[in-house]
């Protein structure tokens, strides 16, 4: 039977079968995990192949250089180079790594200055971080969040009384150049010395000398002990300036997710948007309003949504039960620079709509010597009110009202020659409150300091003090209370409570101060 089957298959059929098999064989090469660089320009590379690349995946080049895939096209991939792209050439190989960008996280980064990839740039040796985490992460969902009800003291009387910031809030600092935006952010970090809040300062597109000055000031005040500085200077590639805020956010989230509180400052997001616009245009993405790409809103919303107050359940789940009954928070103070006070430009309006309030700093106020140059009329905190300490909440109502009435009356007073007694008193009180809100840089006020100042103003103890002497009077009053009423000040700082006994103690303290001092 077997022999007869062999006889039926003649040699010509065998050769035809073999030819058919050879013809059907697919010999075309498909580049899956390796590709070839076909174009290099301005920190952007176009790679032919890499069919398996993911969006945001790390791409490895020859010489240990890495890139990040941002454009996935039919037969090529557009990537930004994370580092010096001048060593790359057309024809070189590029490989998928299967990993997304990660940066080191943990307490080891406190006191250090790092770049957008978490590499130390302060000359203090390597960072021995035990953990790394993804730069791009999804923000906690609604179910895991908790309402903001604890304060972040910025140390500024004008902010803590009228525009309070809570833990887990996003409060925008917006203003023209040279209006004190960075100074306010640095003071907010210095004010956290005794609060236990860890800080991250992200410098985007700034001069290296400016960043060095900030670091020096933080070291002088002892604030560097609980602060990490992430620096993407003006001379760094656009890709680094684009990534720096996300890297800093991941470093801050390490503390939030473990039931601690953190504060992050993005200085400033206008420059990040410009860097992202540059990358997008080089990647040939279609431009939109002001030449920004269509997803510039998403650029900032996905970053700022990661700042949140998370519930104890979230922390417990994240730490696998290691931390219980602790909520965590990441508070964001993004900074936006406006051009000639134009807050209706594209990026400012985007960030205003994403954040929970804004602090407007004005050039005219700054030049008039009112520093911090906060415009209390259009500055607002949408959630901070519920986070204020009891004593500040109780006392600060009069400040906002006095300033609002003063602004309204000051406009009328320009045209009216004779003013009645009540109006004149309101104007004078408004002038004194405006003067009281002035504050020197690097001199944060504690809760107790603010309470004493505001109480003295509200109850008319400054009515007989000359306007130009208000600042000196206030400084002397605080100094007197710190030396003569130290236990009371300590109690207010620790509890934030306000009752009849505390009010009586503050009142008698101010009266005894006024009896000994003449202003």
From Swiss-Prot:
Catalytic activity: ATP + H2O + 4 H(+)(in) = ADP + phosphate + 5 H(+)(out)
Provenance organism: Acinetobacter baylyi (strain ATCC 33305 / BD413 / ADP1)
InterPro entries attached to this UniProt entry: ATP_synth_asu-like_sf, ATP_synth_asu_C, ATP_synth_asu_C_sf, ATP_synth_F1_a_nt-bd_dom, ATP_synth_F1_asu, ATPase_a/bsu_AS, ATPase_F1/V1/A1_a/bsu_N, ATPase_F1/V1/A1_a/bsu_N_sf
Keyword Cytoplasm applies: no
Protein name listed in UniProt: ATP synthase subunit alpha
Site (Required for activity) location in chain: 379
Ligand binding (ATP): 175-182
GO terms for MF: ADP binding; ATP binding; proton-transporting ATP synthase activity, rotational mechanism
EC code: 7.1.2.2
Chain's gene name: atpA
EC main group: translocase
Disulphide-bonded residues: none
Membrane topology: Peripheral membrane protein
UniProt keyword Translocase, yes or no: yes
PROSITE patterns found in the cross-reference section: ATPASE_ALPHA_BETA (PS00152)
Key words, A-Z: ATP synthesis, ATP-binding, Cell inner membrane, Cell membrane, CF(1), Hydrogen ion transport, Ion transport, Membrane, Nucleotide-binding, Translocase, Transport
Family the UniProt entry places it in: Belongs to the ATPase alpha/beta chains family.
CC annotations in GO: plasma membrane; proton-transporting ATP synthase complex
Main location: membrane
Complexes and interactors: F-type ATPases have 2 components, CF(1) - the catalytic core - and CF(0) - the membrane proton channel. CF(1) has five subunits: alpha(3), beta(3), gamma(1), delta(1), epsilon(1). CF(0) has three main subunits: a(1), b(2) and c(9-12). The alpha and beta chains form an alternating ring which encloses part of the gamma chain. CF(1) is attached to CF(0) by a central stalk formed by the gamma and epsilon chains, while a peripheral stalk is formed by the delta and b chains.
């Amino acid at each position: 039977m077997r022999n007869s089957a062999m006889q039926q298959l003649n040699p010509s059929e065998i050769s035809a079968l073999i030819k058919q098999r050879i013809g059907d064989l697919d010999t075309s090469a498909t580049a899956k995990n390796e590709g070839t660089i076909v174009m290099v320009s301005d920190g952007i590379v176009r790679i032919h192949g890499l069919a398996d690349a993911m969006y945001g995946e790390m791409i490895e080049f020859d010489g240990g250089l890495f890139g990040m895939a941002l454009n996935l096209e039919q037969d090529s991939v557009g990537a930004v180079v994370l580092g010096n792209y001048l060593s790359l050439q057309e024809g070189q190989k590029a490989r998928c790594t299967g990993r997304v960008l990660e940066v080191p996280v943990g307490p080891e980064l406190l006191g250090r200055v790092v770049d957008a990839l978490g590499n130390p740039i302060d000359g203090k040796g390597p960072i021995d971080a035990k953990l790394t985490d993804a730069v791009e992460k999804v923000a906690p969902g609604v179910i895991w969040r908790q309402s903001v009800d604890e304060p972040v003291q910025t140390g500024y009387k004008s902010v803590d009384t009228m525009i309070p910031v809570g833990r887990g809030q996003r409060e925008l600092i917006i203003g023209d150049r040279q209006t004190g935006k960075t100074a306010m952010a640095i003071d907010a970090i210095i004010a956290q010395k005794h609060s236990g809040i860890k800080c991250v300062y992200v410098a985007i597109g700034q001069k290296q000398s400016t960043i060095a000055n900030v670091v020096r000031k933080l070291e002088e005040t002892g604030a560097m002990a609980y602060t990490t500085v992430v620096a993407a200077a003006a001379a760094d590639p656009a890709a680094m300036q684009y990534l720096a805020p996300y890297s800093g956010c991941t470093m801050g989230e390490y503390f939030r997710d473990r039931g601690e509180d953190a504060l992050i400052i993005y200085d400033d997001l206008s420059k990040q948007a410009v860097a992202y616009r540059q990358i997008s245009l080089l990647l040939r993405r279609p431009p939109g309003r002001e030449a920004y790409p269509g997803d510039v809103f998403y650029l900032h919303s996905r970053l700022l949504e990661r700042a949140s107050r998370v519930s104890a359940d979230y922390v417990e789940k994240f730490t696998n039960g290691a931390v219980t009954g602790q909520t965590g928070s990441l508070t964001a103070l993004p900074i936006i620079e406006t051009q000639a006070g134009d807050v209706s430009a594209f990026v400012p309006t985007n960030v205003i709509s994403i954040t929970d309030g804004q602090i407007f700093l004005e050039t005219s106020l700054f030049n008039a010597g009112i520093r911090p140059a906060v415009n209390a009329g259009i500055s607002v905190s949408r959630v901070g009110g519920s986070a204020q300490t009891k004593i500040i909440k109780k006392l600060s109502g009069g400040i906002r009202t006095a300033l609002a009435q003063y602004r309204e009356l000051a406009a009328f007073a320009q045209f009216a020659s004779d003013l009645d007694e009540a109006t004149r008193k309101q104007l004078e009180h408004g002038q004194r409150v405006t003067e009281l809100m002035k504050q020197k840089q690097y001199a944060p006020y504690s809760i107790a300091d603010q309470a004493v100042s505001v109480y003295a103003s509200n109850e008319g103890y400054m009515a007989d003090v000359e306007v130009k002497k208000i600042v000196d009077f206030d400084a002397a009053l605080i100094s007197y209370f710190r030396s003569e009423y130290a236990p009371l000040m300590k109690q207010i700082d620790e509890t934030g409570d306000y009752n009849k006994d505390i009010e009586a103690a503050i009142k008698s303290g101010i009266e005894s101060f006024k009896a000994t001092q003449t202003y």
